């Protein structure tokens, strides 16, 4: 697009450069309407180019009435390209000189700066001129990760929804996986979202690595060393047993070549095994032990595994624990939308999962996202969005689940090499691991009222931008100061307002809209039933008819019998 700029001399707010220090210029400005203020953009005439800078300080000129002095940080320039068309580019090839003229940028200049390339997407409007769309470069934003920071109740969730909808619109080859910590984004993307709830999630226990599985077994508490050693020894054997049993059915002569104890599987190999096989191995070991204390370790471990298997809250892990089946490819395709079928984004709802396993589940999906990118050589670009990021990658190394932090840090540091990009969302950036957030080169800073959060934000930006951060405590609803690789200049913007149907659930709640009358007893009973159901107790209200106790699922006995059956089959094949 060709832009013809009006001469600076005819522009309002004409000023003159009277001091220069590096890329900073001091400009004498007349008292004009509208007056220049902090955050405004100025254009400086510099030969065939116009230097573009942002006002970071304004004060009265002492000896000259009706004039003010502005300090401007120069950040880019508008220059003609080979075809004579004006283009904006970041950085400068020349510096301002004493006597150069300056003026407030026109709407035409602002549009030129923010028009971007073919992959640019509109996410809102500029605070300085609401007629000018605020556009971001999706390629630059995704390639070097991004973060959205803001206190609760400032429109952060709707801002995230606007950004992700822009990704879906303008980058159809990018799949999006979002961790939804409060189950509020299900309706933000319409029919394009694949919503995975705790009831529909399928994440078999054998896809967990050892650290993740142990964290589930012990509910986030410290593990017992003796029991961990038992798992370390027998999980690889159980994997070998599953493979051997599979070969018995598919290749009778191949089965005798597989020794389950020498199958080559490691503790972390993501291959199926049956929980009853693992239990049978532990039970067999317990039967050979004479030391009561050692036997108790086996007994307690078996009890833990049986409790998990029979707990309906863990059905997403153990529903088919004794059925088998290698479903890893199908699960990866479903979670990461490898075959989108019109739904390129997965919204994984975490509220409703057992609180003690949420960290492990997040760790699993983050690790799987990176590993799939690694082994697929980045053929399927994936944006991994982590809400409540300070919970899963805390700055305090003694808090949280260490492997989850490492999984997110691995994506932050190396993910872009394999087409895995990171988007972080947090209301407490000061509690987020500084190494993780330092890898995010595009930041959207919404209102932050906590001084520690503001201090961290100031430390994360250059001195030129630091003055703009002073706006952060007073930003309005849906407003943000955005800066970094995804934007041409540090920008104060207002995110696009979503329709009522697309708003995150947290932003549709209004106290005045809620019923204030007495609660109906039937409604309260329904709430209690849902409450108990989420804890695995089922419906137990007084109106429910008594039900016979369910028959306990066969566990150790069947597993031991299966082990003996498998050995007999292998020996029989060997003799024949």
Q: Model regions: which residues?
A:
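Conserved ATP-driven motor cores of ASCE-family P-loop NTPases powering translocation/secretion/packaging/pilus
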Residues: 219, 409-414, 418-494
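Conserved beta-strand position immediately N-terminal to the Walker
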Residues: 146, 348, 423
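Glycine-rich phosphate-binding loop of nucleotide-binding enzymes
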Residues: 120-203, 482, 512-516, 524-525
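Basic- and hydrophobic-enriched, low-structure N-terminal and domain-boundary segments
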Residues: 1-149, 377-380, 395
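Conserved AAA+ ATPase small/helical "lid" subdomain
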Residues: 229-250, 470-501
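Conserved P-loop NTPase motor module
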Residues: 273, 477-576
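Hydrophobic residues in beta-strands of the RecA-like P-loop NTPase core, especially within AAA+ ATPase
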Residues: 179, 386, 425-426
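P-loop NTPase motor domains
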Residues: 183-187, 193, 205-208, 212-410
